[in-house]
Regions:
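Conserved N-terminal phosphate-binding loop of PLP-dependent enzymes in the Aspartate aminotransferase
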Residues: 1-121
Length: 121
């Protein structure tokens, strides 16, 4: 499809020119750091991990999470409750705690701050 090919080429040009990846990683780290900090202060069983522009929120007191066995012990019912709460607030997160959320190039410092405030349990 020539239209899809043209769109892909233009997308690659924009990504090369603007290089949003460091900003995406900074935002994902900001979310993880905020969630983990608040979790520790409130003694909540929440652990957020990030890599690049991705993050995942786990409901567990096990830290660090090193493998799939650690992750399987997380509270999926609590995550489902969190997912529904965030969906009502207009955030579409992955519906499973075994998937990751992605920061996009359209997210701003303000939208990340709002997410952190809205996400706090």
């Amino acid at each position: 499809n020539p239209v899809a090919l043209a769109a892909g080429i233009e997308t690659m040009k924009i990504l090369k020119k603007e290089n949003p990846y460091p900003r995406l990683a900074k935002f994902a780290k900001k979310i993880a750091d905020a969630m983990n900090s608040k979790s520790e202060k409130k003694s909540q069983k929440v652990h957020c991990v990030n890599e690049g522009g991705m993050f995942t929120i786990f409901f567990t007191d096990k830290k660090p999470l090193r493998n799939s066995d650690d992750i399987k012990c997380c509270d999926t019912a609590k995550f489902a409750e969190f997912f529904r709460k965030m969906l009502k607030k207009g955030y579409y997160l992955p519906p499973s705690q075994f998937e990751t959320a992605f920061i996009s190039a359209v997210h701003t410092e303000k939208s990340i701050e709002k997410f952190i405030m809205d996400a706090w349990l």
